[in-house]
């Protein structure tokens, strides 16, 4: 495990290393970690030591001084650092281990870094994937239909000033849900800025429209799926947990086959990059690059 500055490290370790129960995930154990941390990101420097200590005392996780020392101790790597800016350099080092890597959200803070991570992995012959757990939420799995004509998703949208792609910090969750429901194929994005949230509209190559509504002051997620003969909407009691994603991670570590293609993940970042440029240009439609 790389990076102990996110609550995910505690939740994931409980699921992998904890006793049998509804959220227990068989097939993997967290055994060693590198602390990491970012001194200029509040949610990192205020938590990195606390979570590291919790992993040591409650779960007896061994800590190492650098990523190279992690390599011989593990069979696969969870790159968990909360700061997406650190992922490129940490992934560069992790790939030298030659072992499969899961990179937690956000994959990176820029499209360029995301593409460079993918290039380095290809060069090293290492398999990887990155995703939000919302891809496997009841919202995304229950409402997915092959005949959908369009999708609207919504979710929290707080930002972090050091992340150029502001959607990557937290709105990655509703963006990931959008792609889970729509599939890849977006060609153009338009973003409208509002006082209480933004609306990001993607036009797919087949003419469908996929929309994300950010809600900075709300922690609720949802979706509406448009179909030829009606509309389906999520309801508030639909559940979301890390467990389905963790099971996919274990399967990926064993098979080397990512549950989300690297190409789709990179398109998600191209979508967010186009949304950022649309915002900077006053809502102008921007083609994905």
Locate each region found by the language model:
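C-terminal helix-rich "cap/oligomerization" subdomain common to oxidoreductases
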Residues: 77-78, 254-289
């Amino acid at each position: 495990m790389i990076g102990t500055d996110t609550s995910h490290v505690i939740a994931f370790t409980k699921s992998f290393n904890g006793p049998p129960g509804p959220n227990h995930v068989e097939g993997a154990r967290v055994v060693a970690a590198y602390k990491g941390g970012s001194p200029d990101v509040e949610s990192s420097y205020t938590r990195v030591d606390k979570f590291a200590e919790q992993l040591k005392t409650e779960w007896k996780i061994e800590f190492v001084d650098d990523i190279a020392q992690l390599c011989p101790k593990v069979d696969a790597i969870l790159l968990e650092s909360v700061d997406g800016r650190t992922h490129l350099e940490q992934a560069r080092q992790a790939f030298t281990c030659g072992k499969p890597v899961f990179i937690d959200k956000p994959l990176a803070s820029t499209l360029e870094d995301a593409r460079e991570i993918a290039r380095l992995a290809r060069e090293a012959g290492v398999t990887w994937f990155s995703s939000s757990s919302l891809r496997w939420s009841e919202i995304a799995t229950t409402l997915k239909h092959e005949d959908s004509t369009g999708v609207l998703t919504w979710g929290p949208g707080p930002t972090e000033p050091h992340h150029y792609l502001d959607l990557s910090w937290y709105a990655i969750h509703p963006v990931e849900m959008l792609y889970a429901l729509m599939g890849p194929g977006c060609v153009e994005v338009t973003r409208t800025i509002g006082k209480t949230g933004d609306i990001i509209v993607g036009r797919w190559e087949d003419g469908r429209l996929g929309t994300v509504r950010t809600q900075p002051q709300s922690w609720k997620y949802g979706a509406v799926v448009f179909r030829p003969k009606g509309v389906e909407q999520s309801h508030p009691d639909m559940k979301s947990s890390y467990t389905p994603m963790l099971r996919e991670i274990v399967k990926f570590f064993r098979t080397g086959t990512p549950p989300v293609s690297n190409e789709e993940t990179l398109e998600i970042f191209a979508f967010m990059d186009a949304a950022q440029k649309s915002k900077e240009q006053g809502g102008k439609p921007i083609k994905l690059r």
